[in-house]
């Protein structure tokens, strides 16, 4: 016959085993959630540093129009590059100090010419960047159309962006002007867009004009409801 002390000891052991069993059961049930949190933590460490106090310029346009080249030219240094969490794309951020003014320039994943509801996750990330970060948009046309998209398609993309984000000023850049001889086809689009700038990002032509425009961009004051 066991004495009371031994019985109580075995009872405590049994209760602890029951508790451990319940805890293990709960952990198993939420294991997928815990694994996802570990994954998210690892990815968020690679997120580029975004300065929400700086004037933010978001570069937009189809792939291969010269966005990365332009970012390098304006920032004057290698931009910060990191994978955007939960996507296979990367975003690049360049930082510029001009006349005691901090400017950050963000190169987003390429936007495609179709309704927002049809966009994939990568494209929606670019939309979020435009909506919540941009104080101005640098929209780049490939005047040579060597990017694989005609000027009409690029113009339609611009109109889509302007319609969705009608409170954000847009600066129109026509890139790769060094590759075309007859500019009459380009000028029919330029005539519809005030303050367009002809540039060659790879040659560095027109960068001074862009910098002057960026100096005039004012930060948009957003309330909490707009930001979240």
Regions found by a protein language model. Name each.
Residues 55-77, 89:
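Glycine-rich phosphate-binding P-loop
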Residues 75-104, 112-125, 151:
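Switch I (effector-binding) loop of TRAFAC-class P-loop GTPase G-domains
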Residues 46-54:
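Phosphate-binding P-loop
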Residues 178-228:
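Canonical P-loop GTPase G-domain recognition
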Residues 23-47:
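N-terminal pre-Walker A segment at the start of P-loop NTPase domains
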Residues 1-14:
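Single conserved hydrophobic/aromatic residue that forms the stacking wall/gate
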Residues 124-195:
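Conserved C-terminal guanine-recognition region of P-loop GTPase G domains, centered on the G4
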